[in-house]
Design a protein with these regions (language model features):
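Extracellular, repeat-based ectodomains that mediate carbohydrate processing or recognition
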Residues: 1-344
Length: 344
């Protein structure tokens, strides 16, 4: 168990015996520190019964890296160099938001990220100027998409073309070697969802601003014949609206947050929300149709907003088929929400 991590080492516990259904008591002991600071840790079971934790090493502008354990979390090791550190060569405050997913065999890690100027040291409003919209925005707008593939045996980091990259990756090196989509100053609050297609290749679902900073759209991003393409799916109501992507045998399923009006203000609404919809494609992502609304409807839920749609995962990080989790609220100011579970 690892909890309480945000710019701290958190609390790391290991059970003395395997946790099993029906066992009345579980005894936990404090485990060694994984790293001095961890933020946004993601944990996966990978090849050879190893465990992987991928994390940001401190605050917004810090590097991202990973550690691997072969003994149930007692000891950890990792690469000599971190994977990314966008502001390491003088581009002060350049940062990234990242999503990651192991390959089907657990030998590789797929990582996709956006970039943004955090503008925290010697802040200057003009650094938030967005030329597409001819206005200042904020650090809540993240741009472009970048992709790397990490070999979890050798720690080599490669781009989509298979080129071995120098690490840590800074912002200029990233633009030259890792960029898969120049969004031309269209921005998002969240990084994309990632899912593997039937060939085991990564595909992405990403929300982006459109005609102005109050209109948004979801895109399906994939690589075909050596080129990255993007297909629009549907409109959305906020740059912080989440999403989830899943590949079934002959259908791609996109779970999105839709709405007609841009949300702003309030403790809860300032980070988006709307209704949860499922959109599907049966032609490899070329065209999409809305299949259903997943979030509750009816008089009791009039005015509710929903967000953070995600898969239910097992202890090894794999998804439970047919189950989704999301959150909803009706008070824009109260810092609380209810969880909803969908099992088709």
């Amino acid at each position: 168990v690892l909890h309480g991590c945000h710019k701290t080492s958190g609390t790391h516990l290991v059970s003395e015996q395997p946790v099993e259904r029906g066992r009345p008591d579980t005894t936990w002991q404090k485990a060694p520190q994984i790293a001095p600071r961890l933020s946004y840790p993601s944990v996966f079971r990978i090849s050879d019964a190893r465990e992987l934790i991928y994390y940001r090493t401190d605050g917004h502008t810090s590097s991202w890296t990973y550690r691997i354990s072969e003994d149930n979390g007692i000891t950890w090791y990792g690469p000599e160099q971190d994977v990314t550190d966008l502001d390491m060569k003088g581009r002060v405050d350049w940062s990234s938001y990242q999503t990651k997913l192991p390959g089907k065999d657990g030998k590789f890690l797929h990582v996709v990220f956006t970039d943004y100027d955090d503008n925290k040291h010697s802040p200057a409003p003009e650094r938030f100027y967005n030329p597409r919209y001819d206005q200042e925005v904020s650090n809540e707008w993240k741009y472009n998409l970048y992709y790397v593939k990490i070999d979890l045996q050798t720690h080599e980091v490669r781009n989509a073309e298979g080129k071995t990259l120098q690490t840590p990756i800074d912002i200029d090196y990233s633009k030259a070697n890792c960029q898969i989509w120049d969004t031309e100053w269209r921005g998002a609050g969240v990084p994309p969802a990632v899912s593997l297609n039937k060939e085991g290749e990564p595909t992405f679902l990403h929300v982006l601003s459109e005609d102005d900073v109050r209109s948004h759209r979801y895109y399906y991003v994939r690589r075909e014949n050596g080129r990255w393409g993007q297909t629009p799916i549907c409109s959305s109501s906020h740059q912080w609206n989440s999403c989830h992507l899943r590949h079934d045998d002959d259908t791609i399923r996109a779970y999105v947050v839709a709405g007609e009006e841009y949300l702003e203000g309030g403790y809860m609404d300032r980070h988006g929300g709307g209704r949860i919809e499922e959109w599907t494609s049966r032609d490899q992502g070329t065209s999409w149709k809305k299949r259903r609304i997943l979030s509750p409807t009816g008089d009791h839920y009039t005015g509710w907003r929903f967000n953070n749609v995600q898969a239910v995962v097992r202890s090894d990080g794999s998804e439970v088929e047919g189950m989704l989790l999301f959150y909803g609220w009706n008070d824009s100011e109260a810092p609380k929400a209810k969880a909803f579970l969908v099992h088709k």
